[in-house]
Amino acid sequence: MTSNYLMKTCTLILNRSKLWFAGSVVLAIALSKISASETLWSLKPLVRPALPQPSITNESNNPIDWFVDHMQVQQGLKPSPRASHRQLLRRVFNDVWGLPPLYEDLEWLNETGMEKGWAQLVDRLLGSPHYGERWARHWMDVIHFAETHGHDEDAPREHAWPYRDYLIRSLNNDKPYAQFAQEQIAGDAMHPGNAESLIGTGFLAAGPWDESSQMGIQDGTLDKKVAQYLDRDDMITTTMSTFLGLTVHCARCHDHKFDPISIEDYYSLQAVFAGVDRNNRPFDRDNDIHQKRQTLLSQKTDLLADRYPESELLNQHAKTRVDRWTESRQSVLDRWTFSVPDFTEETASKASFQPKDHSLFFPKPASNQGLLAWTFTSPYTKPTGIQLEVLPDDRLPHQGPGWASNGNFRLSEFKVFSRPAPTAPWVQVQLQQPQNDFSEHTTSVRYLIDNDDKTTWGILPQTGTAHRSFFEISPETLIQEGGQIKIELQHHHKEALWIGRCRVSLTDAARQDIQPFLAAELAKAFSTPEDQRTRVQQLTLSRHATLEHWNQKLNELPPSSQVYAATSFFHSAGNFKPSLGPREVRKLIRGDIQSPREIMLPGALSQLKDIPWNPGERELSQESERRLTLAEWISHPRNGLFWRTMANRIWQHHFGSPLAGTPNDLGHSGQAPTHPELLDWLACELRDSNGSLKHLHRLILNSSTYQQSATFRDAAAKIDASNQYYWRMSPRRLDAESFRDTLLALSQDLATEMGGPSVKQFNMRPGIHVTPIVDYKGFAPGESAMTRRSIYRFLFRTLPDPFMQAMDCPDASSWTPKRTVSMGPLQALALMNDEFVIHMSQRLSETLIKDHARVPSSITALFHKALLRDPTPEEILLFSEYTSQHSLANACRFLFNSNAFMFIE
């Protein structure tokens, strides 16, 4: 007696009785132990099964047909005859390309014949780029790929599309399935520097991401840890369900109730992904450019970490670089002009101007809070930067530069205003990119432009010396030469911590050149005559000259591309910061962040003892090593789950249903395969053909089982109403993408362009928060963006296309191993009234009218295009009358709504 049978029987007893809840729990635990004790079919070693003996009536040479025939004989079933050429063409074109065949394809197959022509046709279809475009969409369903974050802040991911193109290329190139899987889990670790492998890690970043939690919650808090655990849970679930068809995430709170997966296994997988985040990741498609960039970046890293050899900084090449650099920097410094005040205002009215160094000295303040302000004439039409220097002075406590008893100051706001003439109103100048040479703890130069009176900039304990703050002036700022500029130094601190002496300067130098000498030692080395510079000063100048030289070389390289993918290194945004290494992962009892237990080491499923974990004995201190080890474990030749899962998915998309009915759950709670030997044989074929997916496609497409008619037979249906033994081909409705792309192809509007950024088939404007406002109806159906294949559409999670949603295009917030196929009034209304369908009907009618003068001829051409057959006399009469009353465009739309068009037999 199998555990599945016991579980179903006991569940039925529970449902029909009124046992206490406690009894139900005890029984559930008992059932889980029965399940765990029985070897799960999907966990058994993958061994090629013996081929069954075909029945006398089975003349096929394809082993697939022998396995299917063997099961049919046991059930008293017989296969259906071969479908017509027309039916087969519509079926295979839709399955492999997601596009309709041409009537010329039917004429060719009729002339060539099935025996010779079918295999040629299959090779042609699998060799076309359209194959990858069709089958990549299936993969995107499984991994819930979309191009926005989802959750409450559904921000767009503008660089997710390279991963989609990676899928299409990989499938078209028939990349070995093991390599395909490994690249998506750890491609960056497999082949460092290889762009294609790096792009593959977009797989781990395909799912939703909680921006508000990741960026808004402070590190180290319980809520942030919960967000990080949940983010890794998405990666674990996607990885294990996609490649192994297991519900590993069910072991997050306790041992899996049905499958041999422990809570320790789950948190070992959490440790594998402990250093992984999602962000835009730069890459170079050209390997030579990549090598140059990496060399320069490595040299920069060594230089900034003081690891670069001093000998390389003091040789003749370095001296030449320093000479060129100091000359160029001097020309930039010459563009800085000190302000000469026209007059002072308010508390600055008693300030004294020092012409020798262009500084202003302010007397001791009479109050704790107040304003220092003065105006001057702008020397430039479009200044690019402004600098505030605070200077020491013997008249100040401890030489200043502030009036505090220790020489410090606390400046609250630094504001700049401009006006073209004395009678014009003042307009505030927008400042950005603040920098300085030093800030007191808890203060910052960026606080000077944050419009917050409570935040300040100070310099304690570095008093008695000069300090600089620098700001870029926004490019949108309009300042005219000869116009007036006003400076305001606002002091809002509770004590009289005013600036005592300072000066302001402006520049109009190019923005990339206007960074001032903020480091005092650099400024001193620069101002020292060359023959008097110490070794330390020479090294200081050489480091900066070399750094600028390398930055220039980097800027000369073509800009890097970007992909939204798994990464451990990125620029911080709010509280979202790179871990720079694996985070600590602890086992959480009941999945509760407040019930942590022992620290977990990276690992996989302990019950699969036949598959070695980390046979190369990597240290696993780097997160990329952990992912690579998991990728190799998952794709191991002895991992039957890996090969069975993919073979099951391929079968599913050719027949409408998988051999094992729950493709993301091959465990005890899922459905066992109807043809276990066939599934194992297909899995072995996939494994032993170097992971060739196209090999499996050919086997299936060339089988008699695939080529059967869809004709319904009462006698067979009484035995097998659900057609699980494949006595006929089950009719299937066109999915959303196939329907849309078919309309484009029939109207001859389908764009042949492949790849590139996703097309936004909607109008978008900023929303109240992060999620934008998206308008699909306002986007004209005649726009060129609408002619691209559906796989190139920009995919929103929370704001999907209403028409595609009505046609059962899946919700990308969740995994979709099998799409729901519904038939209801909403679809009929969408098919009749959607602007895209109306436009495509009009475009097709224009083509028909152009090529055919008479209505009956147009009707015949319409049937050839849409249904691949001649219309009957009754259909010609019906459509001709309808056309005369309602137009040919409406007749096209009428046909698009028919079962004959919507369903593939």
What are these regions (language model features)?
Residues 390-392, 488-495:
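Short beta-strand-plus-loop segments that form exposed binding edges in beta-rich domains
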Residues 398-413, 496-502:
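Short coil-to-beta strand junction motifs in C2/discoidin
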Residues 318-371, 392-394, 417-481, 579-617:
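Disordered, acidic Ser/Thr/Pro-rich linker "stalks" and the adjacent N-terminal cap
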Residues 190-298, 302, 487, 497, ...:
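Sequence context surrounding c-type heme c attachment/ligation sites in exported
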Residues 56-90, 95-96, 100-130, 145-192, ...:
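Primarily short, surface-exposed interaction patches in extracytoplasmic proteins
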Residues 379-385, 479-486:
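Extended extracellular/luminal ectodomain segments enriched in beta-structured repeat modules
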Residues 29-52, 137, 148, 157, ...:
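Post-cleavage N-terminal segment of exported redox proteins
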Residues 50-61, 205, 209-216, 220-232, ...:
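Electron-transfer interface patches adjacent to heme c in soluble/periplasmic c-type cytochromes
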